[in-house]
Amino acid sequence: MNNNKRAIVGALCVLALLALASPGPATAADEDANLKVPRFVSLHSDKVNLRTGPGRQYPIEWVLTKKDMPVEIVAQFEHWRRIQTSDGTKGWVQEHMVAGKRTVIVNSGDVHPVYQLPDPASPVVARAAPGVVARLLECRGTLCRVEADNISGWMQRTDIWGVLPDETVP
């Protein structure tokens, strides 16, 4: 092989090694790891294993079975998220088992009014029973707009779980 061919082959080998050694593009997981904690997300599946630690080697303590249920991320470690449910249950899940879709769950107690407008003096369009999961659309002050079963309206922030007290939701 002549010197030109050796130089070209050598240069290609160096480029290949550099390409392998360089970090790849940022992934969704990398971006997720940079989001603030605590934050709310929802379950991505109707079967989510809740583990005692951040890894498959840790035992499953609970199995969550309600897709779209809101959970709060309270810690993160690599590709694992420590979550808390509305009843205070905590455990670790793989990051792909939660989604950015925002939902809320209606707090326990009596049924709660759903208002037509972001004003408690506006007409009540529905009443939400405890445990109902609704999609979170936006929050303004003490009221949040939610949607469930094709009914949309505003609920008191204190009547739902799945949004931080001072959080702005577009």
Regions found by a protein language model. Name each.
Residues 1-5:
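N-terminal secretory signal peptides that target proteins for export/translocation
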Residues 10-21:
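Bacterial N-terminal signal peptides
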Residues 26-52, 63-67, 74-89, 93-118, ...:
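SH3-family beta-barrel domains
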